[in-house]
Amino acid sequence: MSQVEIRKVNQDELSLLQKIAIQTFRETFAFDNTAEQLQNFFDEAYTLSALKLELADKESETYFILMSGKAAGFLKVNWDSSQTEQVLEDAFEIQRVYILKAYQGLGLGKQLFEFALERAQISGLSWVWLGVWEKNVKAQLLYAKYGFEQFSKHSFFVGNKVDTDWLLKKSLS
């Protein structure tokens, strides 16, 4: 059986984080976006300088999930002023949970998501929330199993294309 480990991403792993972030986003959303839209998104969200700032943020954490020592995906969580939006008082945001396609179906996404929920629980905050693409029914059903409910929605830009994300929340009390 392969060993699974979840650990924080280090500053010296920025290139690996960038590679995995781009690859997982492309694998997940390329079917609904042009190459230009994806590249514009990557040029904004996944530059080395943007990722370096995220890793340095004291109100945000980024983790790799490793299988047999190889990065298989990543997680990013935020709280306080580092949340992508201030939509709930006293809240913890799960911003990104991505698993490389080659590692999907092995339960790694579930492990990473449950790790995020544990981080939310020990934060002492009242709510955990996340955004999910309105067309990603599979993820919506998963989040519903964990007790998340839709409370709002927002626009998510991939290049010049506007998608709608549902905002889901769960009480931590």
Where are the regions a protein language model picked out?
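C-terminal "cap" of GNAT-fold acetyltransferases
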Residues: 88-92, 126-140, 144-146, 152-173
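Short coil/turn segments at alpha/beta junctions that flank glycine-rich nucleotide-binding fingerprints
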Residues: 106, 123-126
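Extreme N-terminal starter segment of soluble prokaryotic enzymes
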Residues: 2-5
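Conserved acetyl-CoA-binding loop-helix of GNAT-fold acetyltransferases
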Residues: 105-118, 141-145
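Active-site acidic-Proline motif in GNAT/NAT acetyltransferases
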Residues: 100-102, 106, 134-135
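Conserved phosphate-binding and hydrolysis motifs of nucleotide-dependent enzymes
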Residues: 69, 73, 107-109, 147
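Acetyl-CoA-dependent GNAT
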Residues: 8-14, 18-31, 39-102, 113-115, ...
